[in-house]
Amino acid sequence: IKITSVPDRWTILRPFFTKYITVFGINIFATKETPDHKIIHAANVLAQYLDNDANRLADNKEVLEELVNNNASLIMSKDENQMESLWDDFPDAVHDLFDNSLGVQDLYGSETAPSDGFDASLEEVLHLITHNGYSKVYPDVFGEQYDSEIADYMDIARGGRFAQVPSRYPSSAWYSYDDRTCDYSCMVTEYFYWALTTLLDAQNDGDRCDDISHEWKLCTPEQLEETDTGIYSLFNDKTYSLPVSYTHLTLPTN
């Protein structure tokens, strides 16, 4: 994995991003101020989500093809402030590109493999893959809408079907995301992340269980298997070639 300059195909983005990596044909654009080792770490996470057995071939070719066809792209900045400035500075042509031609997910260098705290690249990179890939290839299974298989499991996890965040979740719920800007489809995206990273044992570290309990109450694979039986079975269905190991995702960052 090597950082290069932004290719000619994406000249319109050069005023904003100076660094570029492609992973299995998926773009990572980064600002000049984003540290190289953060970019490479994000690229490694992306590579290992897609190629979890590390045989240099994508585990799910259909999902990869969809991601490439959608021009799935991770855009990275030094931190949140820089990302907000970028969105303000983008001309209409860039916003149109993102809206119509690129499947974009942003990620901050400051939240990527931090010295203390959770590695947000595990979340944001997975959102890129599930939203632009799995939900499109398998709409009846992973679609981010009512009545897909994953949405039905999410409704169980939330204690009911809620189009918007309820004023109070049922006490039986183990998924209780409370961001009121997150609509139903967004809730599915977040649920996919919480459940899969729990299966990978990525949430079971130090005080993490307490830190996330207001949104997600399962933090070990065993708890997921015992409580969220439907999603546990779905994620272990080899039809979909989802990642099964977190060890491949903790690669050196420099």
Where are the predicted features?
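N-terminal low-complexity, Pro/Thr/Ser-rich intrinsically disordered segments
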Residues: I1-F16
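A short, solvent-exposed beta-edge/loop patch
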Residues: I26-N27, L199
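Extracellular/periplasmic catalytic domains that process cell-envelope and extracellular macromolecules
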Residues: I21-T22, E66-N69, Y184-V188
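Acidic/His-rich structured neighborhood in mature extracellular/periplasmic domains
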Residues: G25-I26, P35-F162
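Membrane-interface transmembrane-helix boundary segments in multi-pass integral membrane proteins
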Residues: E215-T229
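Surface-exposed intrinsically disordered loops and tails
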Residues: D207-K217
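Post-HExxH zinc-binding segment in Zn-dependent metallohydrolases
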Residues: Y134-E190, L196-D205
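Conserved small/polar residues in nucleotide/adenosyl-binding loops
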Residues: T247-T253
